[in-house]
Amino acid sequence: MKNFLLCLGMLILLFQSADASLTRSAQRETAGIVPAALYDISVTIDPEGLKYSGHEKVTFTNRQQKSTNYLLFFIYPNDPALTKSKDPFLTVSNVKADGVAVKTEEKGPSFRIYLPEALQTSKTVTVEFDFQAIIPQQSGTKDLFSEAMDQLSSILNPTGKQPDYGIFSSNKDILNLGLWYVALSKFDQDGWDEEAYAGIGDVSYFDPSSFNVRITAPAAYQVVTTGSSIKKVPAKEGKLEHQVESKLTRDFVIELSKQFEQKSAIRGQTSIRSFYLTKHRGSGEKVLDTALRAFEYFYQEFGPYPYTELDVVEAPLYGGAGGVEFPGLVTVSSMLYKEDEMGYNTSTLEQLLNQSPAFDQLLEFVVAHEVAHQWWNAVVGSNSKKYPFIDEAMANYSAVLYFEHYYGREAAEKQMAMQMKINYQMHRMLGGSDQPVLLPASAYNGPLEYSAIVYGKGALGFDSIRKEMGDEAFFAAIKKYYKKFSFQTAGPYDFKEVAQSIQPRNKEKLEVMFKHWMEEEHGDEDIGQGSLEALLATIMEGNSTDNTIDEQQLMKEFEKLLDQIQTPPQ
């Protein structure tokens, strides 16, 4: 028995990944990739006091053919565009570079650490500092209907304020710590990326880095992060130190809750886990099922997933955000999770809308979209601030492909109508104008326009390109694109050029088609402007044969709601 246990232990060590966060096949494939930076962070989180503090060390090697006198970081908790607060939430102190105290400069979220001497090509520097932060608290979690009504009200009565997505926030159940640390900006041949967050769309633009993070938190809290847990060590005062390793990831997120339940499954070398509040068990189990199926399909059609974990975590997101992607972990808004026993009163309109199958399918679509971001954001990087369509339109179309694979082309067409065409048509009905897809996030006038053009028209553009190429060539292009740009940064024309290389005889047609959908304004002719009647018909389409929904009543209730929303408060 002892010999058996010894052999078993040796076998486990033999097959255990040297880099716990990367699959064995990914370790072989990425052996020549050097991380942009090495993060070593120790943080202690006080969930009850809504604060955290710690020490961060970042080692950076200059791999560009130009020197730099400083390192540029972003302190996103101090970005009003993200937190909607003028007050900073995170402070930095005791800054050193290679052990020497140095000068710093902070302007909003931008934080420069000036070096003792210019960092030349191939030279390395290590900077370190202490930090302490306060975690903003949201007033409460809204259900899907309430959130949708808030969004509609903000569209009809614009204030000029952009939404707070809740990426860095907490409510009474969950701490959602996205972008919580001091993050090194991207450094390339043009220098440091100094572009601020536009207040809409994705926040960050980073190269793959390596993280070693030690998180100390009360033992009663479940801690879920990017990367893989190496071990947990008991700490003082009933706390645990969670030691986490994450290789070749562009970001690092932490989620905490005392109320999390977990359900998981293994696919290949990857553990796929769903974390959700106990009261949302039914939805949490559906999330896992969707994540598993999306993972299997995308792995088959796009290429291998490189990480040993994929976590889908319920989080308190707001401002219309259904989910937010991070490497190896995606969050899904609590508003999409249903309580297992719903005993509260709802409005007539909400009761009517809840009978639509479209609302049951929304959670599935969002999970598929967010899982797709592991391929189109985590692995294939892009400048999401400058070219948001590269990952968002592709992830949205990937969710359509998921529906087509599992439910057929008719189901996929319905999702394109619900998730893409409706957004564009609503945008036009409310007076918005058509825009090119190939624009920076900052160029769009609010979240509805951003969603209509980037998520909607952009994804429909990929569907048209697929129809032109045919399935065999299109999916060959996707596989080649994924392999070529894994852990790299894809540009706005890279997928088009890969597609043209797969189908050179069609090069000119693909050029024209890409320009038509991504650079020009043909939304009305390609998608249509729509009407309120058509919009509601699309929402109601697909109800069961014993349909008890009165569409005339639905129309009256919706028009009544619009009148209420558009009437200024007295």
Residue positions per predicted region:
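Solvent-exposed beta-hairpin/edge-strand motifs
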Residues: 68-100
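Extended, low-hydrophobicity, Ser/Thr/Pro/Gly-biased non-transmembrane segments
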Residues: 130-255, 259
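Long, His/Glu/Asp-enriched segments that create or flank divalent metal/ion-associated functional microenvironments
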Residues: 523-570
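Juxtacatalytic substrate-recognition/specificity segment
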Residues: 213, 261-374, 378-387, 398
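N-terminal, polar/Ser/Thr-rich
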Residues: 15-53, 171
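Amphipathic alpha-helical substructures
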Residues: 410, 451-526
